[in-house]
Structure formats: structure tokens, C-alpha cells
């Protein structure tokens, strides 16, 4: 026994295995079956010489990869019409019931072409590469013979229900090499045994080498190495009940292909009808297709479905990306306007706090604040309504949300007027501000105290504030929080160019741009009853922190006065969007719980005010002269006041957010240091190891350091550089801690 392994277009001699491949269909699997090695003891072979009656006898067996030889199957198939199923197109026109193409080549050629033409018929037939037919050496075969001429596309769509052996484009045949007349291996379409083509009825043993391929119409998994579908008997019986026309085909295929025992008389009684086409064209209809587990699809339909799914998926992704871009654009737009308004508002606040004489001469300061804010509300509401009407994203703010922001914004200034008329506009201390009523407790604020407005002004202010102050108990709670906010950050008053000189405005503008740093207002690190001690303790750290990063270049504020969103959204350092919760979340940042949440954003928030100088027309004239105005003796008081505001924050030792991020532990025995960055841990471990990789490159200096900042500090001894300057006096220092100690001299003493 000798067979050939066919892989692609190449032959490999082997006597055990043969390989089938069908790469053109996505839902087909690569099949591999074991060919039964026929021994003389298993099957009695009767080889006849070439005779006139039996010149082309087909020897077909039903071993079927199950290691069972059917000794007497299909013995009486020759009694019917010769040339019934195999080589002649005259008996059955078109051979639509065939599936496999058996190409038996001459032993001198072994050619595998992509286009063959049948010698006896007029149909064309294409053989794809990778599916070349197996050919044996037939010394007496004059010309290649073909078992079927149906095109590939037609055969792919004509696969029947009961065919477990349908490999529509397979051109495979593994025929034994006999010394007698040539034998042709013909595989039946539905797995049925094919009658012989010889003219005489002989008792020759017929051997059928078939393959067990997974049918495309069945989605059941295979339960054994020989590719038998799960519950095959149940499926065939159910289909026989539904479609009795194909019952013959199903019974023959089930008996001769899928049963492991030897079926000696399965096809002898059906020899009269085995010549008929196994599957009729009208049998494949909708009623038959409904019984299958998977629909019958051609490869073209599968490809088009995949393309449609891919196009739909891409279209959905594009829509999602467009929506995200629109949302990001709107958020950036709102944040820009909030930052711009914050610059202008803080400048006005600083001017009005330290220079009350800059207000309008005829009106009290509180009334000016209300009128200015009403104008800003009107502009802001119009602009936000325009933005929301033009935006298509449903997640952005609506005009109703903006009206809620403006109403709470009006309540803020209404509450200021109520508290101001009661007991001093800025000097009325509140019990809810952590004990830090700075403007009433510090003695140096006497020259900047703001007197309460007159009776007429307070009446006008109360009349202005009454429509907005009657909105419910929840808004009264917001007013209390806003009062706390305004004690730490007083509102701004307008200053016009007609009433302010260039020197005063330039000095105030420069001081505002230099000292406008307002960090998130959080509970202080010391006892709430001792504001002076916490002020002194944090002044050094405040000055050092301001000096750690160089100030960025000043920005141009040409779009400053266009839109004015509420400044409360940015006063506390939160980048809020125009939603319903924007006012409530930012106005409640004075509570300890929310202050803890603000600590994670401190590094970014501390740099925001430095990038927001207030360029206005009244400060453009004397900006350069105003840089030196902080050397005046009167400005030391509001330097200390600004430092006192900056002290309300956590330090590095009691910040719970930093404790969560400290994940790098020192592994040395007895050391409990933990760091947030691995680079800090490496620098610390050099203390234990004694490593000092940073060497001073100054001539005749051999100092070495474990950290780069220590080397930088050491270089200043050689160069004499003193980059840390006092903002009050003209002294400079080479180290930031020395400047922090010096700043304590400028702080007022608490009595």
C-alpha cells in the first residue's frame, strides 16, 4: 500500500497520512484523516487483467477512516446503467450531484494547472492551487478523466443536508497502485456509494476512500478524531421525517459513512435508485433551510456582511470621536473665560481692599459692587445662552444651569450687603470661619478698614438684594458659606481711569500681579485659635514655595473684558464646568472634607495665579515703575496679610492625600522613610550607602554630594549668587531657608 501526501502542490511519499485543505472558505476547517492501511489479511484483492468487459472497473470500499472494511458492500451496483455517475456526461447531464473532482494524471506529467479542459465534455473546470488532485502512476491510462464538471461556485451552493463528506472544491484521490487495468477513485456526492463504470457485473471488491469533512450547513462541534458531528443520528432521522425525498440519500450516507461497523448489505437493495441524483435542486428551499442550525451562505455573502459590519463599526467610532471633541472644546472655552474673569475680578478685589479711595466718589463701595456685578451677570448670561444654543452636545450646561449660577452669584453680593449693613462690611467677624477673621484681628488693617455704608446706601442695597435673597432655605446656607468666602477674599470695587493716578494704579497693579497667589482655602495646620502662630510658622514656607518656580512671562489680556463668568468658580482653584453643581461644589470648599479633596490638586492650583496677571488699560502706563513700589514701607502690611491667607493649608507631614501616595519604602534596617517618588527614595538611600556621585567641578574643590540640589546650593558659595530676594526690603540670600527666617522680621507681632 502506498499513498501520497498532498500539501498544496507538493507530493510527499508516505503510507499513513493524507491531508486535505480548503483555504478558500472561511468556515471550513483544515482536515486530517488517517487512511486505513490495507493488509492482505484484511481484504481479499482480486485483480483482473485488462479485458474488454471490465476495462474501467471502479474499486470502491467503505473503510471511511473508521478502520472497518466492508467486505461485501456495493456488489450489485454494476447491474444498473453503466457510466452512471462518474465519467460520462451523456448519462447525467451536468453531473450536478458530484462533489469531488478526481484528477487522474499520467504518471509522466504530474501537472497541476489552474484551468483544465475535459477531453470528453464541453464544460470548463477550475482547479485552485493548494487543492491539487492526487494522482497515482497509471501506466496504461491514455488520458486524464474527470468525475465532475460543475463549477466551484455552483457546487458551493448545492451542498445537501445529509452530506457530512462535502468538500466542494476538493480534488483529492488516493488510489492504490495495482498492476492491472487502471482504476479510478470516485467519491459519491452525498457520501453514497457510487456504482461502477464497468460494463460487466462482476464480484470485484470496491473500495471507497472518502474524507470526513465538516459540512458548512452544520454548526455542531466534532466529537471524535474522525470528524463525526455530534448527534448525527438524531439529525439525520429528523431531516428524513421532514424531507422524505432525500431520505434515500440520508440513509445511504448514514449507513456507509458514519457507522463504524461493516455494512455488508446496506446498499445492495437500493442499487436501482442509487444512480439518481442524490440531492434535487428544489429540495433546497426555505422549509429545509429552517431546519438547519446555521443558514446557508455563500462566501460572497459572508464577505459582504463582514464589510457592512466593519463600516457600521467605523461609523459609530467616528460619531463618538466627534462628540468627545465637541465636549472638550466647550469645556476649554468655558475654562478660558472663567480664568480671564478671575484675573479681572482679583485685580479689582486687591485694589479695593488696599485702596478704598479708588472707588467712585459719589457712591458707597457696596453699591458699586452690586451695580458692577449686575452688569457682568447680564453679559455672562447672554454669552452662555448663546454658547449653549449653538452647542449640540447634550452633556453640556443648559441656560437653566447658567441662570442658577447667576442667581447664586447675586445672592453672594446680597449677603455681603446684609452683613455689611449690620456690623461693618469687612470687619464683622463670623464664627464659621475657623476663627480667622483676619481683618478684625490684625492691628495693621486699621488703615484699610472699610466703613459700613450709609443708611441710604444700605437701603438701596437691600432693595437691590431683596429679589434675589428670597429663594429658600438652601440658598441661605449658600449665603453663609459665601460670607465666609468674602471675609477671606473681599469683593472688588471698580476703579475708573479718571479717579486714579498712574503711579498709584501702577503700584497697586504690580502688587496685585506679584502677590495675587490665593491657594485653596483649607483648614490650617495649627490650632484654630492662634492665627498669629500659624502665620509665622508658614510665612517661610510660603516665601520659599513662591520662589521655587520662576514666574512665567506675562500674558496679553486682549479678550479680558468680553465675557465675565462668575469668579467664584475660579477663586477656590477649581476648574468647574457650567453644571448645576458647579456653584455648590466650589462654594463649599471651605469645609474640611472638601479641603482634603483639594489637596491633590495643589501643585497645579499654586501655579495658576502666577500665570494670570491683570493687564488692564489703567496699569499699562507705569508697570515698570510699579515693580519697585513694594519697597515702600507701607506695603509690608498687606504683604503680611497675603501671607496670612496662604498659611491655611496642610503641610507634608499631616496631609492624608500624600500619605496615600507614599508607596516607596526604604528597605534599610531601622529606617522608616517613605516617599512618593522612586527618585526621592534613591537619593535618600545614598545616605545609607555613602554614595556621593555629584562632585563639585570648581577648581581645587573636592566636595561631593549625594543629591544634585545640594551641589547646586554649594556652587553658590563659589559664584556668590543670591537668587532669593526679600519682597519687602532689598536683601538677598543664597538659600531659601535663610530668606524664610528673614521674612519673620517683617511679620507684625501679636499682642
UniProtKB/Swiss-Prot annotation:
Keywords: Metal-binding, Neurogenesis, Nucleus, Repeat, Transcription, Transcription regulation, Zinc, Zinc-finger. One of its GO terms (cellular component) is nucleus. Highly enriched in the peripheral nervous system but is absent from the central nervous system. Expressed in neurons with more than one dendrite including da neurons, bd neurons and the dmd1 neuron but undetectable in neurons with single dendrites such as external sensory organ neurons and chodonotal neurons. Residues 95-125 have a biased composition (Basic residues). Disruption phenotype: Severely reduced growth of microtubule-based dendritic branches and elevated levels of microtubule-severing protein spas. Gradual conversion of multipolar neurons into the bipolar or unipolar morphology. Residues 57-89, 251-267, 309-351, 374-393, 458-513, 527-548, 594-610 have a biased composition (Low complexity). GO terms for biological process: negative regulation of microtubule depolymerization; negative regulation of transcription by RNA polymerase II; nervous system development; positive regulation of dendrite extension; positive regulation of dendrite morphogenesis; positive regulation of transcription by RNA polymerase II; regulation of transcription by RNA polymerase II. One of its GO terms (molecular function) is zinc ion binding. A zinc finger (C2H2-type) spans 664-688, 694-718, 724-746. The keyword Oxidoreductase does not apply. PROSITE patterns: ZINC_FINGER_C2H2_1, ZINC_FINGER_C2H2_2. It is found in: Nucleus. Residues 57-167, 248-275, 304-351, 374-410, 458-578, 594-639 are annotated as: Disordered. The keyword Nucleus applies. Belongs to the krueppel C2H2-type zinc-finger protein family. Transcriptional regulator which promotes dendrite growth by suppressing, either directly or indirectly, the expression of the microtubule-severing protein spas. Determines multipolar neuron morphology in postmitotic neurons by positively regulating the expression of genes involved in nuclear positioning including several dynein genes and the nuclear migration protein nudC. PANTHER family: DENDRITIC ARBOR REDUCTION PROTEIN 1, KRUEPPEL-LIKE TRANSCRIPTION FACTOR. This is Dendritic arbor reduction protein 1. It comes from Drosophila melanogaster (Fruit fly).
